[in-house]
């Protein structure tokens, strides 16, 4: 005859099964994200649009039931440029399709010193065509930027592509490099997400605080650029007797540059076109601010005097 179980025995079996499920779930959570989950989280960093092919997860270390540290190599693209003294420096990093962020803005937001002495003469090459900047110089500059002592596998140069631009005042180049980045992740309701990052001997930095600090610097930069355009419009009016009449900032810039405005300024630090509405006796200049939407509370406005 089949063995019969009492109600109490069945209850104990059920409780034991549930306990096993809970323990198993906690054990899986304690393992941290898988490599694919970590890669997905890194590609979701809103400040830096990365493809999966640009992320190589090296290791995952669980630091708690819902936290983990991930070591990864990221393929990043930089613009290098020479300064007034002919010294090479890192000027921009690509943060998305046709979108670049100025290194100076990032450094100001993080209160970081990006000065680097990487301009010693390169040794002569044998059997190879020299490129400028050299791989050695590019590695030195990026190592200094990220707090990494070079030579190191934490900075590996994939490509140096000089960019000859006709009539350009300063030589420039595009550099593709793999940079070792430590990422701190948290398992939130929507899945694993990156909350902090660190490179080389730098301290951990929170991504949300970086975004806020960077937006503050961009507001300051936008205000400075709008003031420059406004000053140019006042000069235009003092000579012509009226402001530029237009509803597009690009039209106003075409009238102002180069006689009244030496720099051609068309987009704000958030990569959105500046707004302009001008009549003969008044004008309004506008940046849509961090949200990129006009007529919201974060707009930056400069009007005629």
Task: Annotate each predicted stretch with a short phrase.
Residues 2-12:
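Bacterial N-terminal signal peptides that target proteins for export
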Residues 12-21:
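Bacterial N-terminal signal peptides
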Residues 24-43, 98-144, 210-241:
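N-terminal trafficking/processing presequences and adjacent post-cleavage segments
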Residues 28-29, 40-77, 93-109, 133-180:
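Surface-exposed, charged secondary-structure patches
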Residues 60, 78-81, 185, 276:
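Short beta-strand element of the conserved SAM-dependent methyltransferase core
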Residues 71, 79, 89-91, 284-286:
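Soluble periplasmic/extracytoplasmic beta-strand elements of cell-envelope proteins
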Residues 84-87, 189-191:
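Asp-box/BNR beta-propeller loop motif
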Residues 93, 149-305:
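Low-complexity, acidic interaction segments enriched in glycine
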């Amino acid at each position: 005859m089949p063995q019969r179980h009492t109600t109490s025995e069945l209850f104990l079996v059920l409780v034991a099964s549930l306990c096993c499920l809970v323990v198993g779930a906690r054990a899986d959570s304690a393992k941290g994200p898988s490599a694919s989950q970590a890669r997905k989280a890194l590609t979701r960093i809103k400040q830096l649009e990365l493809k999966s092919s640009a992320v190589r997860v090296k290791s995952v270390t669980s630091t708690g039931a819902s936290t983990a540290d991930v070591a990864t190599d990221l393929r990043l693209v930089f613009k290098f440029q020479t300064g007034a003294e002919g010294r090479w420096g890192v000027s921009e990093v690509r943060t998305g399709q046709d979108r670049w962020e100025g290194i100076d803005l990032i450094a100001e937001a993080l209160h970081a010193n990006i000065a680097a002495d990487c301009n010693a003469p390169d040794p002569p090459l044998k059997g190879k065509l020299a490129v400028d900047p050299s791989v050695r110089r590019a590695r030195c500059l990026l190592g200094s930027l990220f707090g990494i002592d070079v030579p190191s596998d934490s900075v590996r140069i994939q490509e140096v592509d000089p960019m000859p631009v006709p009539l350009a005042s300063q030589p420039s180049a595009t550099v593709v490099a793999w940079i070792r980045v430590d990422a701190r992740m948290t398992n939130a309701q929507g899945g694993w997400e990156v909350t902090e990052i660190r490179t080389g001997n730098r301290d951990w930095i929170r991504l949300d605080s970086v975004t806020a600090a960077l937006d503050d610097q961009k507001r300051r930069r936008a205000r400075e650029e709008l003031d420059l355009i406004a000053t140019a419009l006042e000069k235009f009016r003092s000579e012509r007797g009226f402001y530029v009449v237009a509803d597009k900032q690009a039209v106003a810039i075409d009238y102002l540059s180069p006689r009244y405005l030496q720099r051609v300024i068309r987009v704000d630090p958030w990569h959105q076109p500046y707004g302009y509405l001008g009549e003969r006796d008044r004008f309004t200049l506008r940046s849509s601010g961090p949200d990129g939407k006009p007529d919201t509370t974060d707009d930056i406005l400069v009007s005629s005097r």
